[in-house]
Amino acid sequence: MAERSAYFIENERTVIHKQDIKIQLEQLGIQKGMLLIVNADTLHMGYLNGGCQAVIEALMECVGYEGTIVVPTFTPQYKDPACQKDKPPRQQWQEIRKQALPFDRKLSEPMGADPFVYQFLRNDAVLR
């Protein structure tokens, strides 16, 4: 698997349009039918004309209906307490397991995610 990155920042005043993003994606070799794993940091991309949706639409247009875009939407708050980095006291694990809310693909919020992730999840064709 090849890993490539696009750098859009020239300075914070840079205005980026969907067409600019498409051009850079095509220069990276993104083509119709590809499978992309995308982790975006849109807060550092300058001014996005159209916001995160402009990036999403540029990606979708580049890969087309034949392609797939995968965006990580981790929900570590649903991990078993025994597997957490900052474990709660062991005597509370059973109660935590009993009272834990189940994962819900529409309602479970990705933790610490970029606004790009939240916008991506709002799109009709997205499966989670």
Question: Where would I find each of the regions flagged by the language model?
Answer:
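N-terminal and secondary-structure boundary signal
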Residues: M1-R128
